[in-house]
Each structure stands twice: as C-alpha cells, then as structure tokens.
Amino acid sequence: MNTNYQYKFNHISLIMNNMKKFFLGLAAALMLTACNENRQPEATTSVDSSSVVTDLMMSRRSIRAYKDSAISRDTLNEILKCGIHAPNGQNLQSYEIRVIDSPALIDSITQAVVKDNPKIAERKGFKNIFVNAPCVVCIAYDTTYDMAQIDCGLLGENIILAAWAKGIGSCCLGSSARWILDSPSAKPYLDRMAFSKNYKLLYCIALGYPDESPEAKPRHQDMIKFMD
C-alpha cells in the first residue's frame, strides 16, 4: 500500500474511533444523568441529545464474546439504578434483581447445570452458561401480577442501554434462566438467590466488555403498520 495512502487511512480511522468514543461518552453522560430521579428534562441547544440517544439505541448489539475484565460494583450500581428507573405498572416495581459477578459462583452454577444437561457444554468455546460473560443480572417477576413480565422487560432494556452507553455489552438470556429452573443440581443456587415469595426467575442479562463487534441484523420494518 502507498505510504501516503496508508497514512491517510490510519488518520481517518483514528478520527472515526475518537468520534465513536466521544458519542458513547456523551450518551453515557446523558443516560446516567437521566437516571437521576430528581432531575427534570431541560432543553439544550449545544447538542441534539435526542439524536445521541437514538444513535445509542441503533448501535446496540447483542454481545456473545467478552473480555475477562471485571465490571466495577460502582459501574454496575449506576447501570442498575437506570434499570429500576424504567416505567412500570402502578409503580409496583414487580421485579427483583440478583447480580452475580463472582467468577467462582458463575463457574459453580455452570457446573451444576451442565451436570444435568451435558450437551450445553458441547457448544463451541463454551465456558459458562451466560455466553461466557463475567457478570450476569438475574431478573425475577411477581407471579401474582399479570403485567410483571412487561415491567421486567422495560427494566432490562434500561439496563442494556445504560450498559452500552458505558461501553459494556450485554445479551438477554432466556435459556440460561430456563436451564437453572429445570436443573435439580442448580436448585441450591436458585435458593441462594432468595427471591421473595411468589417471585420466579424470568430471564438473565449477561454483561461484560465486548470482545467482538457484530454487524446489525436485519429488522422487519413491515411489522409496523399505521391505522387510519
């Protein structure tokens, strides 16, 4: 490759990477500021915050390859605070959250599940049942409230977007929750989660620093229809 061309290519790549970091950082600031329960929205003229949030949503990807780096508890608390500020029916907050960021505990749960379902471990690159993430958020719902699962979904989306704004990837995992629920060997770990009476594990969210950059998958725009 021509030396001058290589220089220009590297310079452009550097600019693009810096722009990406800037917008993710800006999105993180906007997202986390929005999680302040005492703050009211304010008009802004310097930056179009709506486009930044839109870009954050559109750039999000499900991540299934993670670095081993741990997420600090302070960072996790900021992300989860955004989660619990999602809208929910009648403000019942009909969910409970358990966070597992101990590698030893994740390995123990994985071993228990695999003991009852060995085929899970046959997956390529398998390390744990949470797509090899170093952290997992387990979300349970109130089985006595018929809208609780909707509330859990809204909670999860806030968690996912707040994490992405901080450069942390995620993946929603219904299968992991099902494996835990269906595994007799994993019952001690489910009991250890100590969900309240009438609460049941619904799904998990894997969290970690991404070790991949997947392309967006097609979405079906024709699923949207306006009624006149």
Residue ranges and their predicted role:
Residues 29:
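Structured alpha-helical
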Residues 35-228:
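Acidic, surface-exposed loops and disordered segments
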Residues 20-25:
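Sec-dependent signal peptide recognition
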Residues 1-18:
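Short, Lys/Arg-enriched N-terminal segments with co-localized hydrophobic residues
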